[in-house]
Every structure is written in C-alpha cells, then in structure tokens.
Amino acid sequence: MSERTAYVERNTLETQVKVTINLDGTGKARFAIGVPFLEHMLDQIARHGLIDLDIECNGDLHIDDHHTVEDVGITLGQAFAKAIGDKKGMTRYGHAYVPLDEALSRVVIDFSGRPGLTMHVPYTRAVVGKFDVDLFQEFFQGFVNHALVTLHIDNLRGTNTHHQIETVFKAFGRALRMAIELDPRMAGQMPSTKGCL
C-alpha cells in the first residue's frame, strides 16, 4: 500500500499555514495555531479518525480568529485531497453518531468530488471561552470546498455548547475514518459507477 500522506503550505497576507497529514496514522497530533479551542477540536479529528495531524499557523490573531480558523480548514481540506489521491479502493462514504452527556451529533460525509456543506447546529451560546462558535461554519466550509466532499453535520440535541461542538468534531473524525478506509475488495477500483470521482 502506498503511503497516504501529504504536506501543504498556504500563504496569504492574513495567514501562513502548514499542514502535514497521514491518513493511515495512529491519531498523533501536534498543533501550533494560537487558538486553543480550535486546537482542542482538531485533536478530536486526529484521535477519533486515527489520522496523524501536524498543523502550524501564523495568523492575524490581533484582529480576530476568523482568518486563522477558515484558512486552517482550507489547508486541511487541500491536504486531504492530496493524500487521498485517485480514491481507488476507498470506502468513500462515512457516518457517525457521537454522544457526550446530553449532546448528540451526527456527521455524514461523501468524498464525491462535489463540495457541499449542510450544517445545522443550534448553539445555545455564541461564545465558548473567547471563541466565536460561528467560526466553525467557516472552518467546515473551507474544508469542504478544498477536500471536495459533501458533508452533512447535525447536532440532534444538546444544551452545553462545548458538548455540542465536541460531539460534532468527534463524529467528524469517526466519519472520516470510515470514509477513507481502504476496502481490499475494492482494490484498484473507483468507488463509483461512473468510473471517476
């Protein structure tokens, strides 16, 4: 099996982002982003997706977190697209339900080649610590647009905003893990009746 790894750098006047990813990892993670709550959520992707992630970002945090959060999502999406390659032998679809106390979220993903995000998370607070929770929409939109995936995110219940968000990211990690899994029965085959994705 060839290694499914990628390194992507993205530099703008607002941020400089570096992402290293191993899709067949063990869940190791290292972050130097400067947004602790985002780093905590990215750790859920690595741990529950069994994906090794190393992300550095030098962003304009003196303004706010917006550009950093969005650009990390964009660059992570680019890294996924690069690491996955031609998608042959890949399961393609993934889904997961994850609870955390009173909160429950569902995430469904399709590495379809068609970017689309449908996200319904009725946050009970606008801010967790100092983090504006609306920025997670920007993170996932950036990821979707550049990983070229269809992604459905639904928080089905929850009263604690931290729990709502954490269940989303844990479910996202587990859905990714399912979707990127290589199926030996599909070795060398495209997971589509069209023959391409």
Curated annotation (Swiss-Prot):
<dbReference type="GO" id="GO:0005737">
    <property type="term" value="C:cytoplasm"/>
</dbReference>
<dbReference type="InterPro" id="IPR000807">
    <property type="entry name" value="ImidazoleglycerolP_deHydtase"/>
</dbReference>
<keyword id="KW-0963">Cytoplasm</keyword>
<dbReference type="Pfam" id="PF00475">
    <property type="entry name" value="IGPD"/>
</dbReference>
<dbReference type="GO" id="GO:0000105">
    <property type="term" value="P:L-histidine biosynthetic process"/>
</dbReference>
<protein>
    <recommendedName>
        <fullName>Imidazoleglycerol-phosphate dehydratase</fullName>
        <ecNumber>4.2.1.19</ecNumber>
    </recommendedName>
</protein>
<keyword id="KW-0456">Lyase</keyword>
<comment type="pathway">
    <text>Amino-acid biosynthesis; L-histidine biosynthesis; L-histidine from 5-phospho-alpha-D-ribose 1-diphosphate: step 6/9.</text>
</comment>
<comment type="similarity">
    <text>Belongs to the imidazoleglycerol-phosphate dehydratase family.</text>
</comment>
<keyword id="KW-0368">Histidine biosynthesis</keyword>
<dbReference type="GO" id="GO:0004424">
    <property type="term" value="F:imidazoleglycerol-phosphate dehydratase activity"/>
</dbReference>
<dbReference type="InterPro" id="IPR020565">
    <property type="entry name" value="ImidazoleglycerP_deHydtase_CS"/>
</dbReference>
<keyword id="KW-0028">Amino-acid biosynthesis</keyword>
<dbReference type="InterPro" id="IPR038494">
    <property type="entry name" value="IGPD_sf"/>
</dbReference>
<dbReference type="InterPro" id="IPR020568">
    <property type="entry name" value="Ribosomal_Su5_D2-typ_SF"/>
</dbReference>
